[in-house]
């Protein structure tokens, strides 16, 4: 199993735990509000909103909550104005990290994110300091337990629909596309009855740094978890992988 997959497995287990606690609903709700405000309340004419609705349903967010968030976005009610920001910096071992934020108070959020970086051996940098190390990609996750065809059939389907790559970890397949091709690939999967666990625009590192020191790896995992747990965080991206010598169980 690759080092990147070790972190992917940790993230996936944590995401399921967060969904069970309902913790994820706040973040999904913000994305619904912002997507509806930016592009209108009709998902057929607003792809960002369509993806936000799909992800909310995958997390078992009640439909009433989904519709309420969309109406807040369309109606532009007071107290629901969020600013989208991206913070960039470095973590332990010189790992490049980006954090996408939705906040109603950028000064508060900046201070809290800076504190997480500095407390765990990193430092927050200037805008643009690391984003050149990443490429924007569409990403579609399919759980292996939900897949009704074999890997070769899935590979053929997504490549014919315009995907660039298909990767896998312990529990899922991940399809990568150019951002503009994600909708076509998503629709091709749905047309074949293949359930999509999550769809998003991701920032994929062009190259990765291998982390071989266990203590440094633990510090990095803790930092990433705190950034992802932050109430205003909508996405965290980094360019590391763990060496084969590091056991995933040691990082939990």
Curated annotation (Swiss-Prot):
Pfam families: TACO1_YebC_N, Transcrip_reg. SUPFAM superfamilies: YebC-like (SSF75625). GO terms for biological process: regulation of DNA-templated transcription. GO terms for molecular function: DNA binding. Keywords: Cytoplasm, DNA-binding, Transcription, Transcription regulation. One of its GO terms (cellular component) is cytosol. It is found in: Cytoplasm. Signal peptide: none annotated. Belongs to the TACO1 family. It comes from Desulfitobacterium hafniense (strain Y51). InterPro entries: Integrase-like_N, TACO1_YebC-like_2nd/3rd_dom, TACO1_YebC_N, Transcrip_reg_TACO1-like, Transcrip_reg_TACO1-like_dom3, YebC-like. The keyword Plastid does not apply. Its main location: cytoplasm. Transmembrane segments: none annotated. This is Probable transcriptional regulatory protein DSY2470.
